[in-house]
Amino acid sequence: MSSTSKHPKGLLFLAFTEFWERFGYYLMIGIFFLYMTTDMKEGGFGWENAKAADVFGTFIACVYLTPFIGGLMADMKLGYRFSITLGGILMGIGYCLLSIREEWAFFTSLGIMIIGNGFFKPNISTLLGNLYNDPKYKDNKDTGYNLFYMSINIGAFFCNFIAAFMRIKYGWDWAFIAAGIGMFVGVITFWIGMPHYKHVDVRKEPKPEDKPVIMRFLKVLAIAVGFGAIGWFIPDTIFGSDSTDGFLFACIPVIYFYSTIYKSCNEEEKKSVGTMYTIFGIVIIFWAIFKLNGTALTTYANSYTDREMPSGWVATTKYLYQCDNSVVAKNDSVFQLDEHFRKIKDANGKPVKCVDYPPYFKNLAPEKYPEQGKELNLIPTELFQSINPFFVIFLTPLVVMFFGFLRKRKKEPTTATKISYGLLISALSTLVMVAAVYYTNNGNTKASAWWLVGCYGVITIGELCLSPMGLSMVSKLSPARYTALMMGGWSLATSIGNKLSGVLAKNWDKFDDKANFFWLNFALLMIAFTVMMLLLKRLNKVFNQ
């Protein structure tokens, strides 16, 4: 870029750094649930859906908790460049450690990734924002962030094709190593671009009036860890698993802390903070449903969806290792499953084995069976995880243009109204899956892949109406002295939603009629939408002040 460019030179390097970071993260996430549930003889852990969903939900919940702490530490002590470098290296190590199929390595790697994400994620955005504080670039800040976030989704789109390639050709371990290599490439890219942003790595000294609040919050976090330990180690379980008990117990002191923040506000501030708290609570439900893409919808793609590769694509996809040929039409020793792919257990609770075709054949139409001993040519399950980022890339400019069109005519809806629309549209996406279940007679036959494409397409529109509004809302409404804490509140809401997503997915196998699972999702989103509509007039009054 020339010196007269509308954007700082550092944008390109930060965008590519973020591309590689998201590449690694979403590559890992795309195969994470599959890895946990795949039979051990095929390289996975062989866990049941409920355990895998619980681990998945806890992980993505913690991933959204640590960035607030990492951001505070970078602001107060570590600096942004060091934090980004440390976080990137830790995440790369974590991804590579997943290649060791041992539970100690598995859970250690998750902890390392959670900590690394906390250092990396908030600080690269802050560094980018600091670049645009230069008066030369200030007017193009929104465009710069759009380009930056576009890189996120490009990374999220392409990574699943690499995941499929590495898994099919080399195995699960090399797929995770590829995620780690991607993260290390991101760190190297960041360091190559260092001359273009080292001058904006300026720590913000907290204002004297902010320090007591920040220190109080850090003490609350320490107490939350103690509460979490109590929840984890209490005998039996209250909410279905030790991790859920621990997580919800840990939330108690944090939520109490946020209630004291509200009480400390003056009457004018209480209106804004109360509005944010209301929306925080409501979007928890959105995230709980949205994040099912990595668990319940992955299960639906893997077992209930016709993944047969179009015949015209087979030769090319085989050459590129984008065609899964692991399912062969021959009898083998497999776990005995019921009609909904649940393991049948004996009187002692141990899974029963039998001689049968692989599970994929259970609801495959007989006319689609290949000859005995022949392999099927299937779309790799992880590729379905690229549908959402594809729609984000494709639809974001259209949504921006649509709201820009309304803005010019002074008809643009408020942030609260956009969030309401997002909830309603997301609710409609669950009806696509209800229709899919009914059309396939509750999974007795496999569904067309277009049902999942349609579901992801609709919920992506809902996401674009809701997700970008969160941080924008906080920056508009938050009292200046509480902005950082309110950003943390948005992350906390996302984190709780992510954990509840795992709780929902854990119950997938308990639904004999899978339509009822998606009806439950629809009901939850409609309740959230209804609450928003009932409060909309009051919320809009605050936004319009």
Regions found by a protein language model. Name each.
Residues 76-88, 135, 139, 269, ...:
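Cytoplasmic membrane-interface "Motif A"-like loop-to-helix N-cap segments
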Residues 63, 140-161, 167-168, 175-186, ...:
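Glycine-rich segments within core transmembrane alpha-helices of 12-TM secondary carriers
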Residues 1-9, 13, 134-136, 164-311, ...:
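Intracellular loop-helix junctions on the cytosolic face of multi-pass helical membrane proteins
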Residues 66-96, 100:
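Conserved MFS/SLC helix-loop-helix module at the cytosolic interface between two early adjacent transmembrane helices
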Residues 53-74, 121, 159, 386-403, ...:
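Central cavity-lining transmembrane alpha-helices of secondary-active solute carriers
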Residues 19, 94, 105-123, 280-281, ...:
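Hydrophobic core of transmembrane alpha-helices in multi-pass small-molecule transporters
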Residues 86-107, 404, 420-444:
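C-terminal ends and interior cores of transmembrane alpha-helices
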Residues 33-66, 140-143:
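Extracellular/periplasmic helix-loop-helix junction of adjacent transmembrane segments
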